[in-house]
Amino acid sequence: MKELEQDLLKKVKNSDKDAFHQLFSNFYDTLFRFVVYKVKDSDLAEDISQETFLRVWKTRANLVPQKSFFSLVARISTNLCYDHFRHSAVRKRHEDQIPEYGK
């Protein structure tokens, strides 16, 4: 599997959409479960998982085929989870500061 993964990564690096689709098919479910475990929300996990693959495609020129693809998508998705939690905390803090009118 490792050789196939490396071959797919080389092809993705060269903008091969079929290879990207194959990586997506091979890794999406595992990544989705990984993200659901972190965020405890399947809709949010789906958004983060899709954004992760979008970022892989956008930065495909920087791919290193010798490295584990799952490690890459796990790192990207973890960073996206952290971003979500940070933004949620800020949003919550601002919502708490809004005075309630009419009560």
Specify the residue positions occupied by each region the protein language model found.
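Internal acidic/polar
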Residues: K2-E5, R91-K103
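Sigma70-family region 2
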Residues: K13-N14, F53-S68, S88
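Residue-level preference for short helical/loop micro-motifs built around acidic side chains
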Residues: H21, R33, D43-D47, K67, ...
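Amphipathic, Lys/Arg- and hydrophobic-enriched alpha-helical face
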Residues: F24-S42, T59
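Arg/Lys-rich amphipathic alpha helix in sigma70-family domain 2
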Residues: A61-P65, T78-E95
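A short, charge-rich alpha-helical start-of-domain segment used by transcription regulators
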Residues: K10-L31
